[in-house]
A protein has these predicted regions:
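N-terminal Rossmann NAD(P)H-binding glycine-rich loop of SDR-like oxidoreductase domains
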Residues: 4-25
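Conserved Rossmann-fold NAD(P)-dependent oxidoreductase catalytic core, especially the SDR/UDP-sugar
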Residues: 92-136
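SDR active-site strand-loop-helix element
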Residues: 8, 32, 63-67, 110-116, ...
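Active-site Tyr-X1-5-Lys
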Residues: 135-159
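Glycine-rich NAD(P)-binding loop of the Rossmann-fold in SDR/ketoreductase-type enzymes
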Residues: 82-90, 133-136, 140, 144
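Conserved glycine-rich Rossmann-like NAD(P)H-binding loop of the short-chain dehydrogenase/reductase
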Residues: 27-34
């Protein structure tokens, strides 16, 4: 049987590439989206309202969770709250949906985006996942988000956080923001 993935954040730069690569390799990829789609493999969810179409989880082996408000916007007090809540709440909605499934029907793995913004800005040190995080807004967001993510281990899932750095690429990421300055 072909492995099946569920992706959140599939409309973003990283998510769309992951979806494309998995599909090219013959994997079935379901996508959770907050916007309706005619694609039969796209399912609706609304983390703010604790809503998730449970059909999205049917026969899923691995969830790749990339959803969250972009950090590439002005950080007003209100938007900082959205950055944090979008990550915590979407992760919580996923975990609660998974926990409602019979144990033998739960995904085996949860891969979540995280960020290197956890670590202090020190050009003379190489950090590992064993190093403590820094201070500041991003470090706080990442600490709270990863705490929420790792609660899914209690569901018998393998959990992995990918601490991603700055992403450069055509058609997205920070490169589009920086190019006008050059």
């Amino acid at each position: 049987m072909t492995k099946q993935f569920l992706l959140t954040g599939g409309s973003g730069m990283i998510g769309s590439e992951i979806m494309r690569h998995l599909s090219l390799r013959g994997y079935k990829v379901n996508n959770l989206s907050t916007k309706p789609s005619s694609n039969p493999q796209t399912f609706l969810w609304n983390p703010k309202k604790n809503e998730l179409d449970m059909n999205a989880l049917k026969d899923v082996d691995t969830i790749i969770h990339l959803a969250g408000a972009t950090i590439a916007k002005r950080w007003t007090k209100r938007y900082k709250k959205e950055i944090l809540e979008s990550r915590i709440q979407s992760t919580r909605v996923l975990r609660e949906a998974i926990s409602s499934l019979p144990v033998d029907q739960r995904p085996k793995s949860l891969i979540c985006a995280s960020a290197v913004g956890l670590y202090p800005n020190d050009q003379n040190k190489v950090y590992s996942e064993d190093d403590p995080g820094g201070d500041g807004f991003l470090a706080t967001v990442i600490n709270q988000w990863e705490q929420e993510i790792f609660k899914s281990e209690n569901l018998g899932m393998r959990v992995c956080c990918l601490r991603i750095g700055i992403v450069l690429g055509k058609g997205g990421g920070v490169l589009d923001t920086l190019l006008p300055f050059f």
